[in-house]
Amino acid sequence: MSEIQARSDAGSEGLKTAAAFTRADRACAFGPSFFMGHLGRFVRDRCPDPKENLPVVQICLADGEALDVCHIVGVSPRWVMLAVSDAASHGDGMTIELVPYDLIQRVCIRTRRGEGASIGFSQTRAPEIIDAETLLRAAILPDHESAH
C-alpha cells in the first residue's frame, strides 16, 4: 500500500468516526461533545487532584441510579466510560462504568465549597479544532456509507 493510499484510508476512517460522533450528538442531549467539551477538564487517565478545585459532577440515569463522577476515561459514539465513586466500597473505591448516552437523563454540576470552581472551560488547555469541511462531510455522510 502506498503512502498516499494509507493517508486516504486514514482520512476516510477519520471521516467515518466524525460522522458516528455527530449522529450520537444529534440523538442524545448528553452525547460525546457534551463530555469532551463541557466536561473536558474531567477527561483524563486519573482522578483530579483536589487542589484543582473542579466541580462535583453527578450523572443521573434513566433507571434512577446516580453516578458520582471522578473522571472521564473515554468516549465512543455509543457510550461514555466513567470512573465513578463506588458506594459499596464505603471509602475511596472507584468503579469503571460504560454508560450508553441514551440512558443519561440529567447531569448535575455543583461547585465545591470554598473557592470558586471552574465549570467546563479552560484557558490553559486549547480545544481540538476540527475543520469545517470535515464536520460538514460528517454531517451529510449517509448512514450506509458510514457503516463500511
Map each language-model feature to its residues:
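Surface loops and adjacent helix of pleckstrin homology
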Residues: 71-72, 85, 109-112
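Phosphoinositide-dependent membrane-docking surfaces
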Residues: 98-110
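Short, compositionally biased strand/turn segments
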Residues: 43-46, 50-51, 73-91
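Short glycine-rich, low-complexity segments
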Residues: 1-62, 113-148
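Short aromatic-glycine motifs in intrinsically disordered, low-complexity regions
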Residues: 53-60, 86-97
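Eukaryotic short linear interaction motifs
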Residues: 67, 77, 89-91, 106-107, ...
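Short amphipathic beta-strand/extended segments with alternating polar/hydrophobic composition
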Residues: 68-71, 96-101
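Amphipathic, interaction-prone secondary-structure segments
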Residues: 56-78, 83
